[in-house]
């Protein structure tokens, strides 16, 4: 579930999922489009698996292993 995915992200990164990753880059969160803007955004792009447990875990680990750069969706061009 989305809640469980959020718990995985919190456990792996120590960051709250929605404020940190819900609108990160051009691909994380709802309605991801275009290509990823950095390594963290690429985690969302590669692991866009719609709540499949193993894939969600891989995404959470991917977030942990990448530097968080605060690349907000508002910076993406249409």
Curated annotation (Swiss-Prot):
Residues of the active site: 47, 56
Known cofactor(s): Ca(2+)
EC class: hydrolase
GO biological process terms, semicolon-separated: arachidonate secretion; defense response to bacterium; lipid catabolic process; negative regulation of T cell proliferation; phospholipid metabolic process
Keywords attached to this entry: Antibiotic, Antimicrobial, Blood coagulation cascade inhibiting toxin, Calcium, Disulfide bond, Hemostasis impairing toxin, Hydrolase, Lipid degradation, Lipid metabolism, Metal-binding, Myotoxin, Secreted, Toxin
Cysteines engaged in disulfide bonds, as pairs: 28-44, 43-62
Gene3D superfamilies: Phospholipase A2 domain
Any one cellular-component term (Gene Ontology): extracellular region
Annotated binding of Ca(2+), by residue: 27, 29, 31, 48
Enzyme Commission (EC) number: 3.1.1.4
Primary location recorded for the protein, binned into one broad class: secreted
Protein's cellular compartments: Secreted
Tissue expression remark: Expressed by the venom gland.
Cofactor note: Binds 1 Ca(2+) ion.
Reactions the enzyme catalyzes: a 1,2-diacyl-sn-glycero-3-phosphocholine + H2O = a 1-acyl-sn-glycero-3-phosphocholine + a fatty acid + H(+)
Example of a GO MF term: calcium-dependent phospholipase A2 activity
Superkingdom: Eukaryota
Family per record: Belongs to the phospholipase A2 family. Group II subfamily. D49 sub-subfamily.
Subunit structure: Homodimer; non-covalently linked.
Role, per record: Snake venom phospholipase A2 (PLA2) that exhibits myotoxin and anticoagulant activity. Displays edema-inducing activities in mouse paw. Also displays cytotoxic activity against some cell lines and myotubes, and antimicrobial activities against E.coli, C.albicans and Leishmania. PLA2 catalyzes the calcium-dependent hydrolysis of the 2-acyl groups in 3-sn-phosphoglycerides.
Protein name, entry field: Basic phospholipase A2 myotoxin-I
Organism: Bothrops brazili (Brazil's lancehead)
Lineage of origin: Eukaryota, Metazoa, Chordata, Craniata, Vertebrata
């Amino acid at each position: 579930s989305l809640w469980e995915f959020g718990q995985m992200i919190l456990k792996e990164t120590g960051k709250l999922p929605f404020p940190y990753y819900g609108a990160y880059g051009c691909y994380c969160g709802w309605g991801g489009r275009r290509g990823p803007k950095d390594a963290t955004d690429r985690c969302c792009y590669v692991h866009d698996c719609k709540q499949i447990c193993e894939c969600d875990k891989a995404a959470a680990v991917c977030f942990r292993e990448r530097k968080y750069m605060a690349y907000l969706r508002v910076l993406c061009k249409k």
